[in-house]
Amino acid sequence: EDYYVANKLMKGFIGSANIDTNSRLCMSSAVAGYKRAFGEDVVPCDYTDLECTSLLVLTGSNTAWAHPVLFQRIQRAKLRNPDMKVVVIDPRETETCTIADLHLPLKAGSDVALFNGLLQFAHNNGAIDEAAIGEFTQGLNDAITSANTIDAKDVASLCGLNEADLNTFYDWFINADTAVTFYSMGVNQSSAGVDKANAIINCHLALDFIGKPGCGPFSITGQPNAMGGREVGGLANMLAAHCDIENPEHRENVKAFWQSPAMPECGGLKAVDLFSAMDAGQIKFVWIMGTNPVVSMPY
């Protein structure tokens, strides 16, 4: 695909990492969250999981408008499985709420408190098999200790939610057979976007809602091909197949596969840094493909 060829040309043959994709401004929080949790930018579920889950959580996403085809798929899944519960977490009552069994209109920016509260609730109600989860994860006790710094009433107050509705959501989540959480720009586009993503991922890891059908923390992209750009290594600090440009072994493997004469040893300028470098006269030539930053990013 075009991203792959452009990235190969720039990094493997021109020898510069000054290339960045729309994934940067769209999905960088999700990328960092996945890398912090799993060691690489990997989405541990796919769209078929929504069709066999017992609980679907939509947070930071007006799916009906932003992902209409996906929303239609959710509607069909709900029609086929009326017992599937849908929770929409959004400060606004959007069209997506028409499919919700429960809408939580939390205060903007309080997502970390909400999901840390869920982790605390799960722990306090004995829903976490700590011995089993501890075999395959690191830091579970630290995460629980951090989550236990506030109680349920404080969470409800911080999030601006009715305590009964909050407890209903928590109860549904810890008692579900399977759970999928879709999160998008309402989570990612934030000064605490990475922490929000990891708070969600932590709940899935702690309750074993990952790595099996109908389960997983799923960051749905906010722009076309924002996932594809990541997979082919189009980000300034990445190489193809989620390889890290600053990892010598990764560099050599990709360089050998490409049979390329050059390979930068460190990440290049990221999108906003590229604009600043252009303004300072440090970048003499720019090739813009498939986007119009003067309109979409008038920095």
Regions found by a protein language model. Give the residues of each.
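Extracellular/periplasmic loop regions
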Residues: 227-230
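Acidic, Ser/Thr-rich peripheral helices and adjacent loops at domain boundaries
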Residues: 233-245
